[in-house]
Amino acid sequence: MQKITAQTCIDVVIPSGTSLQNLRTSSLNKDNGMDLTRDLYHMDYGISRYAAAATVFRTLLTPCTGISVEGNGYRYSNSSTSTTGYSTPVTDANAPVAIRAALEACREPYAVTDMSKF
């Protein structure tokens, strides 16, 4: 991405992939073989998508509105361990970790942040 943004007129990159990589270094990445995906390729329906949404919000809306995603009360409570539709529910306990993964991705979009303390 750095190469593409340097060679084009693209000014903003939404680092959703980086936020997922950050999340994978946290305690939320359970040893279930799914790696926070729903099918080993796509983000799981719960916490991974929540982190991606927080990244989009922080990248596009926060700079224009000054509104922060912290304190957002939305929770996705569905849980599934299906190998075709895995979903880690978003809870009051893990939502701040996903939001932190998004924050760190926006701060350092081209580097993975170690979140093992979260």
Predicted regions and their residues:
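Extracellular serine-dependent O-acyl
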Residues: 1-34, 53-65
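Conserved catalytic region of serine esterases and O-acyltransferases that act on ester linkages
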Residues: 33-118
